[in-house]
UniProtKB/Swiss-Prot annotation:
Name recorded for this polypeptide: DNA-directed RNA polymerase subunit beta'
Principal EC category: transferase
PANTHER family: DNA-DIRECTED RNA POLYMERASE, DNA-DIRECTED RNA POLYMERASE SUBUNIT BETA
General function of this protein: DNA-dependent RNA polymerase catalyzes the transcription of DNA into RNA using the four ribonucleoside triphosphates as substrates.
InterPro entries: DNA-dir_RpoC_beta_prime, DNA-dir_RpoC_beta_prime_bact, RNA_pol_asu, RNA_pol_N, RNA_pol_Rpb1_1, RNA_pol_Rpb1_3, RNA_pol_Rpb1_3_sf, RNA_pol_Rpb1_4
Organism the protein comes from: Serratia proteamaculans (strain 568)
Keywords annotated in UniProt: DNA-directed RNA polymerase, Magnesium, Metal-binding, Nucleotidyltransferase, Transcription, Transferase, Zinc
Binding-site residues, Mg(2+): 460, 462, 464
Listed Gene3D superfamilies: 1.10.132.30, 1.10.150.390, 1.10.1790.20, 1.10.40.90, 2.40.40.20, 2.40.50.100, RNA polymerase II, clamp domain, RNA polymerase Rpb1, domain 3
Residues where Zn(2+) 1 binds: 70, 72, 85, 88
GO cellular component, as recorded: DNA-directed RNA polymerase complex
Statement: the UniProt record of this protein carries the keyword Transferase: yes
Cofactors: Mg(2+); Zn(2+)
Gene from which the chain derives: rpoC
Amino acid sequence: MKDLLKFLKAQTKTEEFDAIKIALASPDMIRSWSFGEVKKPETINYRTFKPERDGLFCARIFGPVKDYECLCGKYKRLKHRGVICEKCGVEVTQTKVRRERMGHIELASPTAHIWFLKSLPSRIGLLLDMPLRDIERVLYFESYVVIEGGMTNLERRQILTEEQYLDALEEFGDEFDAKMGAEAIQALLKNMDLEQECETLREELNETNSETKRKKLTKRIKLLEAFVQSGNKPEWMILTVLPVLPPDLRPLVPLDGGRFATSDLNDLYRRVINRNNRLKRLLDLAAPDIIVRNEKRMLQEAVDALLDNGRRGRAITGSNKRPLKSLADMIKGKQGRFRQNLLGKRVDYSGRSVITVGPYLRLHQCGLPKKMALELFKPFIYGKLELRGLATTIKAAKKMVEREEAVVWDILDEVIREHPVLLNRAPTLHRLGIQAFEPVLIEGKAIQLHPLVCAAYNADFDGDQMAVHVPLTLEAQLEARALMMSTNNILSPANGEPIIVPSQDVVLGLYYMTRDCVNAKGEGMVLSGPKEAERIYRAGLASLHARVKVRITEEIKNTEGESVHQTSIVDTTVGRAILWMIVPRGLPYSIVNQPLGKKAISKMLNTCYRILGLKPTVIFADQIMYTGFAYAARSGASVGIDDMVIPAKKAEIIEEAETEVAEIQEQFQSGLVTAGERYNKVIDIWAAANERVAKAMMENLSVEDVVNRDGVVEQQVSFNSIFMMADSGARGSAAQIRQLAGMRGLMAKPDGSIIETPITANFREGLNVLQYFISTHGARKGLADTALKTANSGYLTRRLVDVAQDLVVTEDDCGTHNGIMMTPVIEGGDVKEPLRERVLGRVTAEDIIKPGTADILVPRNTLLHEKTCDLLEENSVDSVKVRSVVSCETDFGVCANCYGRDLARGHIINKGEAIGVIAAQSIGEPGTQLTMRTFHIGGAASRAAAESSIQVKNKGTLKLSNVKFVMNAAGKLVITSRNTELKLIDEFGRTKERYKVPYGSVMGKGDGMEVNGGETVANWDPHTMPVITEVSGFIRFADMVDGQTITRQTDELTGLSSLVVLDSAERTGSGKDLRPALKIVDAKGDDVLIPGTDMPAQYFLPGKAIVQLEDGIQIGAGDTLARIPQESGGTKDITGGLPRVADLFEARRPKEPAILAEISGIISFGKETKGKRRLVISPLDGSDAYEEMIPKWRQLNVFEGEVVERGDVVSDGPESPHDILRLRGVHAVTRYITNEVQEVYRLQGVKINDKHIEVIVRQMLRKGTIVSAGGTEFLEGEQAEVSRVKIANRQLAAEGKIEATFSRDLLGITKASLATESFISAASFQETTRVLTEAAVAGKRDELRGLKENVIVGRLIPAGTGYAYHQDRMRRKAQGETPVVPQVSAEEATANLAELLNAGNLGGGNND
């Protein structure tokens, strides 16, 4: 018996491995895997149902059909183990060998492997340097190919048609060798000398100058070198032996009624075997060439279909007209091996049911129906029953449980105690979609869920279902309790704010409780404390809202950090005093002494967590919930039709709007305004009217008149139920109330355009038929959008996870001094995001100096906490350089300091944290909240866009950066620089507002001057771009020839005449070469020089420029010489929402991107062509100038002779991230992508920490292009992993050799995922065939570094608790020990894991 157990144990041992290599299989290798040749297409005998000998299910080749029993039944039982039966030839062993033993088919004629032939670029074609078309013609027997030319004039690899071949035969006889079919290609491949070929190609590469040729050569060299290094032989891409899959992986299942269901592979194999056998027979018979050829072609097609059906020609279909599933289809796609069985599996010990509310549960509990618990915990119950001696055998225990005896329930109670279960709600968009709870047994059949975790699950109780999973092993239970317990997940990993926040009823209850009311019962009482407040409220002596004085004792930390009690009498209300009783000691009373809305409650929980830690916060959250529910019930807030008060002014506002619309209609009919203007104006009028109605309604709703104690009427905030719900943040918003009691307003058509007749009614009044019909548009579009959005958002998340999955924190500090500058996000006059929110939880990259001094406020490498951020705010620091993952120098993974704080835990991140996946989830999860729309800017919006002045909002000092200006005669500044920025600094030196000042603006006040709020500081004309002179003097026209380069126009209304420069297209012959310009000369007629240069002041005029000056007039510096009208680009579509985020992460180039200056220098224009202008930038140091052709229709923002910096905008448009990376560097592109993505999310009110976006950007910047190879193996122009190049360079530097240089590339997330080092990860993402083909040819090794690869091979992932295991393996490998397969007892494992978890200081998980 003992050796039987030993034998069974030995069977389960897995082999330890460090990496997985994929390569081409040689024929000998295939034969070595095989256990015999499959010679017949038969499967099983239809009478006996036994497998046919030598057939596809042959027992002699693949193993016995029944355990330890040969086919003919001579040997049965275990004692004959390993005997081979002499009658039927079957080895006596377990049946499961039929899952692993392979067979093979000896092909009568070689066939090409379709993957290496047809998967683009064709590997065979690239290797032979022949077009795919030609190779196919050879393979499918249409033409001959010359294998050896011999002494003839035929080239090797030359293609010959039938006639040419016959001619050549006549001419040369057997001096040359030409064949057709796969034999020919095989011979060509076999005869290749790879090393020799490599040499010649490298020589060619050094000599050639053509870019396309270089690219082609580089590709071939890479492929050839891959073959040389991997030890693959090219001729192995042609199959001579075909492996046969083990039969249990392509089963034949008998159905009832004598029919069989079979895997498609069997059909495909049968075709191959039939054709192969027929071909063998024909060859033996020496059949005519044409018949053999046809058979060979058919064999080639059969093998193609088996390997990848439908890749070439029409897919082979089965009896039901469906294409057969080939081997390639088995592994690719959502239903393929990778995504269906390896990355996600169905699990046992799980159940699902509908969820209902459990308002009495504690945060760490969930209600589990008894029926479910009994089923899920069965094995544990059986074990306990046997242990107690209540059942003798498992069978008896089973019976007891089935009968549901009383004792079983007691045992279930014991088993369940302290055994957490996991609850999951699909779709699991982020890690908080699976959390652990302690089950509480309940009657009924629905799972009860704690209301506070609904936000994390995005669950509601309208019929949602959830799944329960039971962690079985001790380790799993420990992880569930320490890491996944709902009490340990209070903060959201996306933004570090509490996610366990009360919503809806609870918020309403707390809001109602903390409101105050004038002249309520019991006003003016003085109470001894919260207890008394509760007593008099219960006794009915005072109202909840009564304003009273209460004696309050607070615990406050003094300057030394000790807790001291402080007692004072506070003006407050009864309700707030009662609420104070549940607030944990250590928080100030001021936190509840205000009407509590949703934001205030969230802030209160956040403060509690930061000051007191995890445990008090969890208890507090529960208490808040119970109290909130109780007082929401007492408040009796309800919705009645009388709560929707329609403002009295509504009718007159609408009437006014209608008269305005009628006026515009009249103007339109008399031709004063165009149709477009009329439409825009009408929409503006109605939008304004809607706003006015809404304002009147809210003023009406939000206050009510009351009589106070002295009998005086005063106003107080309203107790209207609907208003309270919206004001507290419990449900609804001003926009929704507007539709109930104001007017519904303008509606959009499905294409996004606005219908100009608004719905003037609201829901309180009711809609008429037309209004109802107009409303249906929007409602339907909403539903259709939601469906699309969910799919798109899920796909975005999948791509993000895939690109970032292998990014893990691997060391504490990489020691870099680089980082990115963080400044507050300021748009116009508002601070969109203050500095503290952007730097909180980051590590400083440099010392932060106190402004105006040399004192160090915060040293470098300090994690910025709330306290430090307060310090920064007090000292009004307005920019901080922080460490970032983008500039982290760790080779594989990132370091903890560059990442900073773990947002979900509030301390610096632990090693082994999978930050890539967290980032992907944080960005993808809110994706469903983003819109799918592209916004048409029309009407109100576009008019706001054409601003013409800057009006500051606050008092402060002006600060101008990158500015050039001249003073005009009036003593005002005229701006002559392009990207001038204006900041408003307050008295503490903080930036309050930030504006772009366009070229040609006139400013009344300059740099460093004081301004008051509301003052206008700059003006400009938004419709034209001026040409400003920087010097004074007299105008001299140059090349301004009437009728050739200019034309004179006279305005009919004013009688003024002006000159308009003609576009080069409009000029006649001689005018084409003239370049109209305005020169400035002094009184003597000599050129005036531009100050600071030796260039004469002359201003070249582009086409369409308007000049309103005459020759010889005197002008002053800062005057406008000419105006260039700006074409208003109609209604522009702004891509918003989800598609915009996807475009940014895919790094797509915009349609007409901004043109940036490639180098710094002076602008000039060279010779023009028909449709393009030649822009020349000459560097100031006199090195080579840069030229670029720019289409004429692009508007340029630069004039001749202007100096630009590298990366400046030359022509406006959306910027391309690739250009930003090339010209302004990694940090600029990071900033660009981060800001643009944040913009989209900010519009929806979603907060995501910048870190997450930076993590994705780091992954997009993984690759670089080699500029010069130095002493490395790399080829110039090849794309390589940046970390690999850096490692190679470090080695070279140590040896004192030349290092390689490279430029960073920005890849979109899909491309970056496919370009990852790990072929397993890439293959399981997209384009499986292409990835595997490429990897096999190159003989790639997958080092199993990422998470995905390890999940696929069935290991612990190298992150989280699996990180230690992987570190241990690496250490052992480095020391040359053999890694032991851990045989750990459960107790040891628990101890180790506990130690590991404590080391990661994960906060206290003591849920009592």
